[in-house]
Regions:
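Substrate-binding rim/cap in mid-to-C-terminal beta-strand-loop elements of soluble/periplasmic
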Residues: 90, 255-297, 308-311
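Active-site His/acidic residue clusters
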Residues: 145-162, 173-219, 223
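Single conserved hydrophobic/aromatic residue that forms the stacking wall/gate
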Residues: 1-16
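Active-site nucleophile/metal-coordination loop of metallo-enzymes that catalyze phosphate/sulfate
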Residues: 17-37, 49-129
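Metal-dependent active-site segment of extracytoplasmic phospho-/sulfohydrolases and closely related
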Residues: 41-42, 60, 216-257, 290
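Loop/turn elements at helix/coil->beta-strand transitions in domains of secreted/extracellular proteins
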Residues: 36-40, 67-71, 133-140, 183-189, ...
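Second-shell loop/turn segments in exported
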Residues: 47-52, 75-76, 87, 111-118, ...
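Catalytic-site neighborhoods of secreted/periplasmic enzymes
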Residues: 98-101, 112-168
Length: 312
């Protein structure tokens, strides 16, 4: 296990209240989530287009999202590539703020500086903001595409799990064990796989191989959910289903509907059940929703908003 120490950020990041228009937009969300979330699991698959999501046979994911909210009109940030969009999911901001404009970004080599950074050069992420506000929270990051972790300061991650060559099943097992070990603590788990994106690049988006890669992931999602149910962890957990872009032919990065519009979902306590939302949504909103569930204020530099219809 690659374990990093948990440390607070002190006064590294500045806080301020939401501007009046945003306060009005999210009044319902503030009122509807009085109790702090116990744990949040981010089920994250790379490169899932809406058509592929609909065509793939995913009974476990379908059953999960039927208990909550689903959007099939969520927009990604430009460019429609991996690192900018996952960074946007996990920092509540677009590339204009966090500065991750391509897949080659590193803390020491990039084109656009972030508008705000900690002492080590990292933009405030969901992990750093939560660790500052809730030192007791446990955070984990499981991934199988090397550059994915680059925008985040590892000292805010309690467990890191990296697998090579598109392997991901072991990370699902590690994530479950992490949830068991930390069931008495608030917990945030980012559980990611790139194999679905690579299937699109190698065989074409919407090819049988691409669809099969999504269905394979659903099997592991089902196993994780079943084990959580057996251990009594399912009912009080919030789950989010996330992706970063779609695809067309053998790639992505453009501005077509198939690349720019993706599925996005959330389920758990106080989340509306069986709702398909039509309101505007974007990858930058994910981290804002997570902070609201944990009852933590949003950094002033973030631009994410909370979809007003998702809470009961």
């Amino acid at each position: 296990r690659d374990v990093a120490p948990s440390r607070g950020l002190g006064d590294v990041y500045k806080r301020q209240t939401l501007p009046q228009p945003l306060q009005a937009l999210t009044t319902k969300a503030f009122a509807a989530a009085p109790k702090r979330a116990k744990r949040i699991v981010l089920i994250s698959l790379d490169g899932i287009c809406v058509a592929g999501f609909k065509q793939a046979k995913t009974p476990h994911l379908d059953a999960l999202l039927a208990e909550g909210v689903l959007s099939t009109k969520t927009r990604v940030v430009m460019p429609s590539v991996t690192l900018p969009n996952w960074t946007s999911h996990l920092t509540g901001s677009g590339p204009e703020q966090h500065g991750v404009t391509d897949n080659a970004w590193t803390v020491s080599k990039h084109k656009l500086p972030a508008i705000e950074k900690d002492n080590e050069g990292y933009y405030p992420s969901i992990f750093s903001v939560l660790k500052e506000a809730m030192p007791q929270i446990k955070t984990a990051f499981y991934y199988n595409w090397g550059p994915l972790i680059n925008p985040y300061n590892r000292r805010h991650l309690d467990e890191i799990g990296f697998l090579e060559k598109d392997a991901y099943i072991e990370n699902y097992e590690k994530a479950f064990n992490f949830l068991i070990e930390n069931q008495q603590s608030p917990t945030l788990v980012f559980l990611y796989s790139v194999h679905t994106d690579h299937a699109g690049h190698q065989h074409k988006w919407m090819s049988p191989e691409y669809i099969h890669s999504i269905e394979e992931a659903d099997v592991e999602i089902g196993k994780l959910l079943d084990k959580m149910k057996q251990e009594g962890l399912y009912e009080d957990t919030h789950f989010m289903f996330l992706t970063d872009h779609g695809g067309i032919e053998y790639g992505h990065g453009g501005v077509s509907v198939d690349e720019m519009i993706v599925p996005w979902g959330i389920t758990g306590p106080k989340i509306v059940k069986g709702l398909k939302i039509e309101e505007p949504n974007n990858t930058v909103n994910t981290a804002s929703v997570i902070l609201r569930l944990f009852r933590v204020d949003q950094p002033a530099c973030w631009t994410g908003e909370i979809p007003s219809t998702i809470f009961k």
